[in-house]
Swiss-Prot record:
Tetrapolymerization of the monopyrrole PBG into the hydroxymethylbilane pre-uroporphyrinogen in several discrete steps. This is Porphobilinogen deaminase. The lineage of its organism: Bacteria, Pseudomonadati, Pseudomonadota, Gammaproteobacteria, Pseudomonadales. HAMAP family: Porphobil_deam. GO terms for biological process: protoporphyrinogen IX biosynthetic process. Monomer. It is an enzyme of class 2 (transferase). It comes from Pseudomonas syringae pv. tomato (strain ATCC BAA-871 / DC3000). GO terms for molecular function: hydroxymethylbilane synthase activity. CDD domains: PBP2_EcHMBS_like (cd13646). The gene is hemC. Keywords: Porphyrin biosynthesis, Transferase. GO terms for cellular component: cytoplasm. InterPro entries: HemC (IPR000860), Porphobilin_deaminase_cofac_BS (IPR022419), Porphobilin_deaminase_N (IPR022417), Porphobilinogen_deaminase_C (IPR022418), Porphobilinogen_deaminase_C_sf (IPR036803). Pathway: Porphyrin-containing compound metabolism; protoporphyrin-IX biosynthesis; coproporphyrinogen-III from 5-aminolevulinate: step 2/4. Signal peptide: none annotated.
Amino acid sequence: MSSREIRIATRKSALALWQAEYVKARLEQAHPGLLVTLVPMVSRGDKLLDSPLSKIGGKGLFVKELETALLEDNADIAVHSMKDVPMDFPQGLGLFCICEREDPRDAFVSNTFESLDALPAGSIVGTSSLRRQAQLLARRPDLQIRFLRGNVNTRLAKLDAGEYNAIILAAAGLIRLGFEDRITSAISVDDSLPAGGQGAVGIECRSVDAEIHALLAPLHHEDTAVRVIAERSLNKHLNGGCQVPIACYAVLEGDDVWLRGLVGDPSGRVLLHADARAPQTSAQALGVQVAEALLAQGAAEILKAVYGEANNE
């Protein structure tokens, strides 16, 4: 095995560093003697913590700086949370590995109440996600949704300080950082459909680096990849990013894949649902099919309004 070095571009947040260390350990396990180093950096999304993601606008808030490092040969691979990865890549870069998915569900976290249903009317719930907000308010219009940004530790500290009655976070991030005991209850995907790619880690690199592609191959998890391909295809067809109220979740059923999609008005007054099944080999086309079903119900009008609000800020 080559003794060449692989440099991993990563954000500096605790969760991003966990993901990078996970990939580092997997690479070292698969290729003894391989030197793997981290290249930590700060993304635009990490700097702009005083505004909701939906108000900042733009795509690639958490990946652009990492992609620049790849393009300028300051790193060999970049490790991302798949839900943060834009649908399109800069010329010369691509997604060449998707690791096995962690729990994709949203997590209800509270120090006082056992579940979303147990929250009294008027309770304050923290989330930075319009996707979560739309589904929460559709189920519980009596709740107050309050803006919540920052890393996992910061969000938990705000809950502990009494700023919120409960907060909603990705279960995967809590599990990976050792905070599984803070999950009061996992929210069923039937009640809160996840973001596309939620819980999965992806690895981006230069398209021409065949040696890097070969080194990444043992880390690739095909079942997860099929699911994420279907979800990302839906997102792409709806021109979605990580800051819009689009949800999608795919599961494998034998040789088929079942994809559910949702577009919601942030007020929770309108939730559009669609789903379909197709052979796993048609995962990408399935995403387009479900997206088209959502568009036929009026999804474009909801998303146009959301993008308009972001652009007017």
